[in-house]
Amino acid sequence: MHKDFSDAQAFSKSFDDPARDAWQRPAEVIEQMKIAPGSVVADLGTGTGYFVGWLSRAVGPSGKVLALDVEAEMIRFVAQRAEQQQLSNVEPRQVAADDPGLAAGSVARVLIVDTWHHIDERAQYARKLAAALAPGGEVWIVDFSADSDIGPPARYRVSPEQAVSELEAGGLKAEIVQGETLPKQYIVRGARPPGQDR
């Protein structure tokens, strides 16, 4: 699914709408991820940077948040946001649509919110994410449920079972996260199998 996200200011009205907090539940998502202070995390498909403040606080001053997006305008917007909010540990980066541009073994967590369904060749992409994970690293996908009243058209949605399958095809051990309370989304976690730890 390809959509024009080049107008960051316009998308900020919906992406950063305070009403989003009620269904996105960012505090719950971050808590589930168990991010260690001082770690490096990636916010893949960062958009206008809705999650960067939460991630910045989770990793702390000695950690780093890589805010990744394919749209140059989104990256400019996030850079301004990080400067205004004094998030010195946020590093916005423009990446290619088919490559997260992450060095091998470089990140502890990758958060992918409302973005997985936009990626083509997801199993191949998952393989690149798996290679980027440090020992104990995890990929977290948060995307729209089939019955959600918001999100992409039904034909573009990716089921949690499909997301699990795609992460596993990329070499990760994946599962649907149980016990979360997001009303419009699911969470899937993919971890590096222990034997792959370097």
Report the location of each language-model feature.
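A short SAM/SAH-binding and catalytic strip from SAM-dependent methyltransferases
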Residues: A108-R122
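A short glycine-rich, Lys/Arg-flanked "PGG" loop and its adjoining helix->strand segment in the class I
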Residues: S56, A123-E138
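A short acidic, Gly/Pro-enriched loop at the edge of an enzyme's catalytic core
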Residues: D98-V110
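Core SAM-dependent methyltransferase catalytic element
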Residues: I176-R198
